[in-house]
Structures are given as structure tokens and as C-alpha cells.
């Protein structure tokens, strides 16, 4: 077994939701990072309430010994001129670089239905044309080049309601892109909800996986997502996602595969939930307890 060095962090989306700001609108940035620290996490991703100035954000985080792992970037490579996406990406890159992050989470939002309340995440998800696939692959490689200019990497986030959701779509993107320029984010919750096998994806692309999201899925709500043709956001409100150990996913074989692979990077606990229904601090503690007991994740000092 290879030596594994893992940084364990948690996303702010359980405290306040970027796609639906009304969820957790009363929660302050400082409350969120205080509770992350109290729960024992070492890092976080960037949420919509975080200070936009790197120096200010670093001050708040340093007081709590927290680090920034990454932050989401919405690309529109299939629907807009490349230059528009690149200009926004460079600003995003420079912010994350200033914060000491090594990877940049990128997801294509061209034709995406993930933010539309009236569109079924399954029935209405986009399917790219051959030309759009070419634009996506070429554009991602160019963004990868821009990231490498400052010693960073892009990690592509397969996501419900987008054109890269299924195993076949992930396979196509990985085949069409240079491994040195485009890496992969591995998200357990999105794979399971989509009906994919997370172990298959991890084992197939372990050499390209440079960032991990641990998200669990509630079986009943996942079934309702299909049966009732719900949108992604409606599913979030309905509670389809939860933290590891609270849903249907068996994380033990996934963790064993991660250990065997020698993965070196962040694992981010992530669960889009309504904080009025699922207290984010309690769920952060629940996830940490489960991960500590079940996997005994070795973390860097």
C-alpha cells in the first residue's frame, strides 16, 4: 500500500447555498468557518459569503488554521466565445493562487439545467453535439495551460444536470483531453445519484483524479428525484444529498481504493442541504466522526 497524505476539508454549501442563497441566508461567513474548525476540518472551498480579497480572507482563515482547497468555476466553452471564459478564469485562478490552492474546480455550464427549478435533472439534461464536445475539450486544455502557468491544475467536475454527468460522458471527456492539462474531480454523490458506479470511475481514472468530494445520497429522496422528475435544486431542497455515513453509499471500498492509489490531496466533505432542516455544524461533526472511525484518514500535519 502506498503512503497516503490526505487533507480533510468541508465545503461551505451545507451552511449557505450558492445556487439558492435563501438557504442559510442568516448564516454568517464567520459562523461557518468557526464551526468547520470546531468540527476538526483543515480546509474549505470558497463560498459566496467569503471575502473576495485574498489578504482579508487569509486573515480570517489563518486565525482558525484553515486553508482554501479550491473553488468552483463555471465555464461556458460550448455556448460562448472562449475568450470570455478565459478572462473570467484568469481572475479566478489568480485569486486561488494567492490563497495557496493547487487545483481549480471547473464545470461546463453551457446548456446546464442544474440551476433551473423547472427542469428535470434527468429528462432535461443537455447532450452536447460533436462540435460542442470539440469546443469543450479544446477550451479545457487551454484553461489547463493557463492554470499551469502558475503551477496549478484544473480538475473537471462531472455534475448532475450538465453535459458531463454519466460514465459515457466522463469517458468521452477524458479520452478527448490531454491528461497533463485536464484532471478530474471525483464526486461520489453525483456519480451515485446519476446511476454510475463510483469505484469504476475511480479505478479507471485514479491517475487523473486530483480532487475528491465525499457526498452521500439518501435512497428515498434519490428515488423521488427519478419518479417525480425533479430538478436538481428541488432535489437539494428535498434532501437527496447528505454527509458521508448518513446515506446509501458504502465509503469503505472507495476509501480502500483511494489508499491503494496513493492519492495525495484534498477530500472535501460536501452536502447541499437546507441548514434549517440539517444543522450544518451537527452534520459536519457527524461526517468527521464517521470518517475518523470508518477510514482513519491519515492527514498531513
From Swiss-Prot:
This is Inosose dehydratase. Pathway: Polyol metabolism; myo-inositol degradation into acetyl-CoA; acetyl-CoA from myo-inositol: step 2/7. It comes from Lacticaseibacillus casei (strain BL23). Keywords: Cobalt, Lyase, Manganese. Its cofactor is glutathione; Co(2+); Mn(2+). One of its GO terms (molecular function) is myo-inosose-2 dehydratase activity. Gene3D superfamilies: Divalent-metal-dependent TIM barrel enzymes. NCBIfam families: myo_inos_iolE (TIGR04379). It is an enzyme of class 4 (lyase). Its EC number is 4.2.1.44. Pfam families: AP_endonuc_2. Belongs to the IolE/MocC family. It comes from the Bacteria. Transmembrane segments: none annotated. It catalyses: scyllo-inosose = 3D-3,5/4-trihydroxycyclohexane-1,2-dione + H2O.
Amino acid at each position: 500500500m502506498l503512503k497516503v497524505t490526505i487533507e480533510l476539508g468541508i465545503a461551505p454549501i451545507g451552511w449557505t447555498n450558492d445556487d439558492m442563497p435563501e438557504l442559510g441566508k442568516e448564516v454568517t461567513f464567520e459562523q461557518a468557518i468557526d464551526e468547520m474548525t470546531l468540527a476538526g476540518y483543515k480546509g474549505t472551498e470558497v463560498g459566496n459569503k467569503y471575502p473576495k480579497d485574498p489578504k482579508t480572507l487569509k486573515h480570517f482563515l489563518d486565525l482558525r488554521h484553515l486553508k482554501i482547497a479550491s473553488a468552483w468555476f463555471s465555464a461556458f466553452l460550448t455556448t460562448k466565445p472562449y475568450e470570455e471564459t478565459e478572462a473570467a478564469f484568469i481572475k479566478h485562478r489568480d485569486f486561488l493562487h494567492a490563497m495557496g490552492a493547487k487545483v481549480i474546480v471547473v464545470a461546463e455550464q453551457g446548456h446546464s439545467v442544474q440551476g433551473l427549478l423547472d427542469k428535470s435533472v434527468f429528462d432535461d439534461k443537455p447532450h452536447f453535439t460533436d462540435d460542442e464536445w470539440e469546443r469543450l475539450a479544446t477550451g479545457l486544455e487551454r484553461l489547463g495551460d493557463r492554470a499551469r502557468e502558475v503551477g496549478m491544475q484544473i480538475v473537471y467536475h462531472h455534475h448532475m444536470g450538465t453535459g458531463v454527468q454519466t460514465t459515457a460522458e466522463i469517458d468521452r471527456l477524458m479520452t478527448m483531453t490531454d491528461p497533463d492539462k485536464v484532471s478530474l474531480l471525483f464526486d461520489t454523490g453525483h456519480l451515485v445519484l446519476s446511476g454510475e458506479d463510483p469505484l469504476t470511475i475511480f479505478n479507471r481514472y485514479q491517475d487523473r483524479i486530483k480532487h475528491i468530494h465525499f457526498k452521500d445520497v439518501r435512497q428515498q429522496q434519490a428515488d423521488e428525484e427519478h419518479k417525480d422528475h425533479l430538478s436538481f435544486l428541488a432535489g437539494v431542497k428535498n434532501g437527496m444529498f447528505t454527509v458521508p455515513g448518513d446515506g446509501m453509499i458504502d465509503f469503505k471500498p472507495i476509501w480502500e481504493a483511494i489508499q491503494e492509489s496513493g492519492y495525495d490531496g484534498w477530500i472535501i466533505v460536501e452536502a447541499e442541504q437546507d441548514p434549517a432542516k440539517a444543522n450544518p455544524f451537527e452534520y459536519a461533526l457527524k461526517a468527521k466522526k464517521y470518517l475518523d472511525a470508518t477510514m482513519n484518514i491519515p492527514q498531513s500535519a
